[in-house]
Amino acid sequence: MARTSESSPYVEFDRKQWRTLRKSTPLVLTEEELYGLRGLGEQIDLEEVAEVYLPLSRLIHLQVAARQRLFAATATFLGEKHPDQQVPFVIGVAGSVAVGKSTTARVLQALLARWEHHPRVDLVTTDGFLYPTAELNRRGIMHRKGFPESYDRRKLLRFVTEVKSGAEEVAAPVYSHISYDIIPGQYHLIRQPDILIIEGLNVLQTGPRLMVSDLFDFSIYVDARIEDIENWYIQRFLALRKTSFSDPDAHFHHYAGLSDRDATSAAQEIWHNINRPNLVENILPTRPRATLVLRKDANHSINRLRLRKL
């Protein structure tokens, strides 16, 4: 049985307990499709999809239906003409750099789009809402890129508000990991999705004013030991020398020719000066706000889950 207590707002599961909640949900993802969704260094396989992500997709499917009934009831109370109009269900996915939240978001998008009644599932990363490099330099915070103040939070809030309000088309800026900057004039157009997934480091942040997390209907925090995340970050950094960093136009091209020793040293410096402080100061404190916490072991596999019941 799942572990819970009357004084805790959470129900805790190990993977064996969680997988029973899949019920009869079919596995509709192929190995070829999963390969295209898997991030660099990620070890997710179809077994994990079946045992972790299928029960999660079932839970969200049930919550989408319940939320639409709630919106319809409110619309009926207000005397609106179209009480059955769908309101986009918004999911936030948070976690550290290198923890695998992008893979989680992509797999979830693929599974949710196969459920009846909500085939239109869009995914947007908050990278597109970073201030452009020129603006970060103007503000003197280029060294704080990825920290909350490096994002145009008003723009992100306005974007999600417009999507959730039913706007026919809303544009999200596009970020390039090659140029390490916003791509001028390029946008990801969102057209009235059934579900919108917002993935990013700081999406569960709170504040004295309305924040984007206040608009989420469901939220996920991808968690792991800090020491494991550091190791994953370093291994990913080493692998990027032969992929993204090898592009002559890449912002980090100067790392491509480093030896393993020098690349490891560079990755450790970036981790301890930027990514670890951001995780400890800003990202990790938002974990209690998540509807569901996915806890990874050192081998990247999800083996524990914590679901908020209140």
Curated annotation (Swiss-Prot):
<dbReference type="GO" id="GO:0015937">
    <property type="term" value="P:coenzyme A biosynthetic process"/>
</dbReference>
<keyword id="KW-0547">Nucleotide-binding</keyword>
<dbReference type="GO" id="GO:0005524">
    <property type="term" value="F:ATP binding"/>
</dbReference>
<keyword id="KW-0808">Transferase</keyword>
<comment type="pathway">
    <text>Cofactor biosynthesis; coenzyme A biosynthesis; CoA from (R)-pantothenate: step 1/5.</text>
</comment>
<dbReference type="GO" id="GO:0005737">
    <property type="term" value="C:cytoplasm"/>
</dbReference>
<keyword id="KW-0418">Kinase</keyword>
<keyword id="KW-0173">Coenzyme A biosynthesis</keyword>
<dbReference type="InterPro" id="IPR006083">
    <property type="entry name" value="PRK/URK"/>
</dbReference>
<keyword id="KW-0963">Cytoplasm</keyword>
<dbReference type="InterPro" id="IPR004566">
    <property type="entry name" value="PanK"/>
</dbReference>
<protein>
    <recommendedName>
        <fullName>Pantothenate kinase</fullName>
        <ecNumber>2.7.1.33</ecNumber>
    </recommendedName>
</protein>
<feature type="binding site">
    <location>
        <begin position="95"/>
        <end position="102"/>
    </location>
    <ligand>
        <name>ATP</name>
    </ligand>
</feature>
<dbReference type="Pfam" id="PF00485">
    <property type="entry name" value="PRK"/>
</dbReference>
<keyword id="KW-0067">ATP-binding</keyword>
<dbReference type="GO" id="GO:0004594">
    <property type="term" value="F:pantothenate kinase activity"/>
</dbReference>
<dbReference type="InterPro" id="IPR027417">
    <property type="entry name" value="P-loop_NTPase"/>
</dbReference>
<comment type="similarity">
    <text>Belongs to the prokaryotic pantothenate kinase family.</text>
</comment>
